[in-house]
């Protein structure tokens, strides 16, 4: 409508970074150097966790059959420990899984791959260069409306930004333990493929712009207020 627009960048370009070294993070989280370390991020809302965590845990069991794996499950502040434990008590007893809280970017730093709910988490893992498979389930009516009303090719923010699927997406009935494990296993067993994905993810940071978005926004507001 003729308004002037200035792109100042994205605040996540500033905030998404590890505060610990790799060695410090390994010690802090109890990372196993022998095992492949996989991050499970089922979401911050109960309904998300209920729909996604069971499939993630079953996929974790399949992966454990194929190679030595250690899993990390960061608990969102909106989710109680008791709620998470309700799912873990029904998981395979052979799973090596650690529930964590806080320092999520340091945790991402030491992980080999990630299984994450759609949302900001996939943008954060992309900025951290962590290969991630996106999983998400909506109610049947919401999915129907979304398919007919929302005109976007992808669900994941990294894919929307880059106009291609750098973060594999499994939606609705494709969210199965077998499908999830198949994607992740490729990264666990083929380091060349994993590094290719990491290189693609670097483009996300380039699209979001340089750091300093908050500072530039404040400066722009001040200049506008002063009539400059």
Positions of predicted regions on the chain:
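Nucleotide-activated sugar donor-binding and catalytic core shared by glycosyltransferases
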Residues: 1-228
């Amino acid at each position: 409508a003729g308004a002037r627009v200035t792109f100042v960048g994205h605040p996540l370009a500033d905030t998404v970074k590890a505060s610990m070294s790799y060695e410090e993070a390994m010690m802090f989280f109890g990372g196993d150097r022998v095992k492949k370390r996989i991050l499970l991020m089922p979401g911050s809302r109960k309904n998300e966790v209920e729909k996604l965590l069971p499939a993630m845990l079953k996929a974790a069991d399949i992966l454990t059959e194929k190679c030595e794996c250690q899993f990390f499950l960061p608990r969102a502040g909106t989710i109680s420990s008791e709620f998470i434990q309700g799912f873990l008590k029904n998981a395979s007893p052979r799973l090596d899984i650690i529930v964590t809280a806080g320092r999520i970017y340091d945790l991402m730093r030491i992980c080999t791959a990630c299984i994450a709910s759609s949302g900001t988490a996939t943008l954060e893992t992309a900025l951290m260069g962590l290969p991630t498979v996106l999983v998400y389930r909506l109610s049947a009516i919401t999915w129907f409306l979304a398919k007919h009303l929302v005109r976007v090719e992808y669900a994941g923010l990294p894919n929307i930004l880059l106009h291609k699927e750098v973060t594999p997406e499994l939606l609705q009935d494709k969210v199965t333990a077998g499908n999830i494990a198949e994607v992740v296993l490729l990264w666990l067993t083929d380091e060349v493929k994993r590094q290719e994905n990491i290189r693609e993810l670097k483009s996300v940071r380039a699209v979001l712009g340089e750091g300093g978005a908050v500072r530039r926004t404040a400066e722009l507001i001040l200049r506008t207020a002063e009539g400059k």
